[in-house]
């Protein structure tokens, strides 16, 4: 459908029907919805792979879900999904295909970009990664002095850091504990300093992740890491090849840096940064958990990819989650979405989802460049339970904002905990189930009074309830389950972007600040080459204050 013939989203009959339905619902009460539908707790569930999804505690009825599915059909979600899986260039502003799904396709799959099957190239890189990972894990890969590598420092930023750093924390119990793995992303020199300060350079390998090998933060950190290595080893440039590998496509720049291009692992333009950690960007993770477990993770991704591609709308988990997000964002004016994993190993999971969701759907123009008249991506936030319960849950329970939330938990703890720590898992999960119940059903003034609470305190101890949550429960946290979870959220984000008619796969919003930083840096250092007159009065005054504080 071309721009001239496309009806604006909020003018479609399906949107109008949802708006009318929302008005008729008024202020839905979950207590009443459950009372009217005794089997709601089992009827409103889905199963995808190892994931059990309970969406019964949402402010929806069968009619709501039907109307939301009609909106998805009218906005071409299924058609755009098929175009993505076919390798069409649905990232229109960059004229690129969007094929992170090809990164986890089986060897015999056929996925074409510009008439070429990309799956053999994907598996060639995976095989190369596996060979390298086994060399490091077995001690065959040695540094310049002949010592085996024991420390790996991954240097990247954005998708080249958040994904592998998150997955390493999630799968820490599956890692080789004899290897130390650290991640550096911030151009603040303190990040690199703390990462290497107690490492033996003779036993340290740096993994430099930059598709173009020109990302300013990454190359600045990589250059400083190279200086540290050569200074500490008191050796020349030839040592670099034994202590640095590259995740890049720019062989010329990689070789210029001193890295042997035989140790360059490539990926492709059709892989967006925030969708890339299951590509070569995941090399450091593969070294940590081993190639077999990395492939288990890819199989988990692929399982949900196939579910998203083939499951009917009524049973399609990513479609459902995406539609629920549209329901709250566009018809309840919810501004944020909390992701609350009840697993310490998922401590970086929500930060990863922040980039996945907010960089994808933080857009204010549609695919045709026209301003949108509806809310798009939410603010995504959250930390692991039970910590959040003693921090911000107060606002969710008794504040004035509607904050839909996802609760993620596991029936079994990780396998290597001490017996006493394993016993704590039931307490953790008791909190997990209690919070969704409390958020949904609250506590009425009558229930508070029945406990003998003084009347003046009754309003303070009343819980309104009706806070919507999705519960995602799995047997245990494994590499496959991690892949399933990430793919679930990837495709949820896709669904919402398709409905909102935005390009979920570009990120022009990160560019302006980078351009301005290049102009401002010479003003800070006094190296010249910049015109202070280009600055607004506030920024100019701040630059002057900075220079004064630095004694310049």
UniProtKB/Swiss-Prot annotation:
Cellular component terms per the entry's GO annotation: cytosol
Compartments reported by the entry: Cytoplasm
Taxonomy, superkingdom: Bacteria
Gene3D superfamilies assigned to the protein according to its UniProt record, in alphabetical order: 1.10.1390.10, Glucose-6-phosphate isomerase like protein, domain 1 (3.40.50.10490)
Job of this protein: Catalyzes the reversible isomerization of glucose-6-phosphate to fructose-6-phosphate.
InterPro entries cross-referenced by the UniProt entry: G6P_Isomerase (IPR001672), G6P_Isomerase_C (IPR023096), Phosphoglucose_isomerase_CS (IPR018189), SIS_dom_sf (IPR046348), SIS_PGI_1 (IPR035476), SIS_PGI_2 (IPR035482)
UniProt keywords, alphabetically: Cytoplasm, Gluconeogenesis, Glycolysis, Isomerase
Class in the EC hierarchy, top level: isomerase
Example GO biological process: glycolytic process
Coiled coil feature spans: none
GO MF term set: carbohydrate derivative binding; glucose-6-phosphate isomerase activity; monosaccharide binding
Principal place of residence: cytoplasm
Protein name: Glucose-6-phosphate isomerase
PANTHER family: GLUCOSE-6-PHOSPHATE ISOMERASE (PTHR11469:SF1)
Biological pathway: Carbohydrate biosynthesis; gluconeogenesis; Carbohydrate degradation; glycolysis; D-glyceraldehyde 3-phosphate and glycerone phosphate from D-glucose: step 2/4
Catalyzed chemical reaction(s): alpha-D-glucose 6-phosphate = beta-D-fructose 6-phosphate
Residue numbers annotated as active site: 359, 390, 514
Family to which the UniProt record says this protein belongs: Belongs to the GPI family.
């Amino acid at each position: 459908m071309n721009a001239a013939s496309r009806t604006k989203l909020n003018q479609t009959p399906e949107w109008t029907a949802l708006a009318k339905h929302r008005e008729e619902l008024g202020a839905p009460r979950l207590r009443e919805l459950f009372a009217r539908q005794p089997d709601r707790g089992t009827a409103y569930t889905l199963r995808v792979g190892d994931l059990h999804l309970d969406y019964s505690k949402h402010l929806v009825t069968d009619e709501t879900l039907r109307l939301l599915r009609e909106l998805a059909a009218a906005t071409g979600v299924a058609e755009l999904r098929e175009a993505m899986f076919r390798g069409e260039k649905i990232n229109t502003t960059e004229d690129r295909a969007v094929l992170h799904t090809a990164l986890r396709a089986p060897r015999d799959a056929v996925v074409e970009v510009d008439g070429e099957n990309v799956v053999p190239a994907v598996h060639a890189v995976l095989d190369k990664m596996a060979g390298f990972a086994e060399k490091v894990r077995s001690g065959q890969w040695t540094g310049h002095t002949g010592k085996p590598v024991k420390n790996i420092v991954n240097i990247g930023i954005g998708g080249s850091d958040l994904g592998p750093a998150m997955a390493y924390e999630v799968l820490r119990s599956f890692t080789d504990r004899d290897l130390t793995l650290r991640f550096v992303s911030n151009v603040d020199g303190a990040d690199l300093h703390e990462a290497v300060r107690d490492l033996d350079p003779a036993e340290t390998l740096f993994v430099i992740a930059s598709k173009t090998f020109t990302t300013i933060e990454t190359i600045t950190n990589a250059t400083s890491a190279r200086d540290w290595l050569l200074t500490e080893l008191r050796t020349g440039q030839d040592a670099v090849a034994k202590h640095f590998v590259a995740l890049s496509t720019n062989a010329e720049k990689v070789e210029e840096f001193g890295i042997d291009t035989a140790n360059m692992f490539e990926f492709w333009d059709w892989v967006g940064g925030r969708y890339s950690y299951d590509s070569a960007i995941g090399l450091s993770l593969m070294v940590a958990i081993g190639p077999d477990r990395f492939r288990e993770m890819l199989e988990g991704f692929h399982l949900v990819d196939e579910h998203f591609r083939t499951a009917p709308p009524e049973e399609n988990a990513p479609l459902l989650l995406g539609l629920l997000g549209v329901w709250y964002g566009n018809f309840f004016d919810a501004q944020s979405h909390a992701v609350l994993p009840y697993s310490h190993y998922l401590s970086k999971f929500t930060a990863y989802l922040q980039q996945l969701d907010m960089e994808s759907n933080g857009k204010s123009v549609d695919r045709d460049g026209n301003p949108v008249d509806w809310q798009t991506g939410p603010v995504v936030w959250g930390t692991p339970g039970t910590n959040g319960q003693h921090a911000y849950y107060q606002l969710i329970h008794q504040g004035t904002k509607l904050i839909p939330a996802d609760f993620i938990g596991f029936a079994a703890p990780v396998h290597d905990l001490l017996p006493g720590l394993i016993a704590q898992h039931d307490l953790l999960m008791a909190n997990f189930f209690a919070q969704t119940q409390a958020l949904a059903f609250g506590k009425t003034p009558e229930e508070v009074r029945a406990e003998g609470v003084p009347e003046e305190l009754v309003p303070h101890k009343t819980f309104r309830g009706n806070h919507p949550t999705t519960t995602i429960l799995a047997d245990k946290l494994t590499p496959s389950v991690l892949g399933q979870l990430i793919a679930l959220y990837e495709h949820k984000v896709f669904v919402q972007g398709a409905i909102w008619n935005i390009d979920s796969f570009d990120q022009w919003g990160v560019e302006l600040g980078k351009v301005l930083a290049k102009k401002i840096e010479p003003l800070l250092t006094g190296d010249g080459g910049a015109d202070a007159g280009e600055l607004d009065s506030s920024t100019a005054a701040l630059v002057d204050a900075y220079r004064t504080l630095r004694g310049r």
